[in-house]
Amino acid sequence: MHGKNIFKEDFYLMTNQKKVLTGDERKRNSKRRYYTKKRAPKKAVSLPPVEQEKVRISFLGGMNEIGKNMTLYEYKSDMFIVDCGLAFPTAELPGVDLVIPDFTHVINNQERIRGVIVTHGHEDHIGGLAYLLKQVNIPVYATKLTIGLIKGKLEEHGLLNKVKLVEIKPRDNITLGSFNIELIHVNHSIPDAVGLAIRCPAGIIIQTGDFKIDTTPVDGDMIDLPRFAEYGKKGVLALLSDSTNAERPGCTMSEKNVGESFELLFRKAKNKRIIVATFASNIHRVQQIIDVANARGRKVAVIGRSLENLVKVGEELGYLIVPKNILIPI
């Protein structure tokens, strides 16, 4: 999503095993000393009251940037959050491991927050969740795989048994105060991704989440375009759409085409070792690598904490089919 972040006040650094910067670091002067070991004093974020019968959408992250996606919806006394991700620091932030959204407005209004819905399990959508849940106690709604990945994050922070996790699926409806939200299946580079149809007295808002239109997805489950069309016919107040690479001509290649390339490359390699670099969260790509390796009598070694965790969670939840004895240690 693109636009300007409305939260630009003070910034602070949290220390809890990792150095975490809160706020939009790209707006800072890199020559100024703003790293502290303790939380710096912050001005309270004061937004004007929402006009009667109107809905307010606030972007706490994910605007004009890749990372720390977080959107806040407000109607009268009810608020809810969509996603809570992290971003990785730029070169101007030495010593900082990750950047999370500014939670001040959420903390100041936590009694009005009805919950957080997570659209999918990428770091830029779930990576900041544990830091938020240390400060506010709200339920988390997400699909099966996304819940599995969130559990790993919460366990790392000692929060696993302290947070209410609610598993949901496409076409489910959730009521959060004045809002009723329907989940709509979308294709992405990770399974179980959803878009949202958000209904409130002010109108219908569509938030697509991250998506691509893949007519031949690996799992055979294509984006639910008919459901989006139905909402279009009803009339939509606002569309919040993923726009990554929207300025590039053409369309995104189907993941199945990537699998065909693997078969060709494996044949060319013959008995040589093959090293494949991939995003850890791309389960469908990992599945295709495993399938081709198994068909050609090869073993697969997984390197990297994130990838190892995803393979473990994906196999446990049935999103990855791993033949017996194909995985080997390094």
Segment roles from a protein language model:
Residues 1-49:
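Intrinsically disordered, low-complexity RNA-associated tracts
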Residues 33-117, 122-330:
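His/Asp/Glu-rich metal-coordinating catalytic cores
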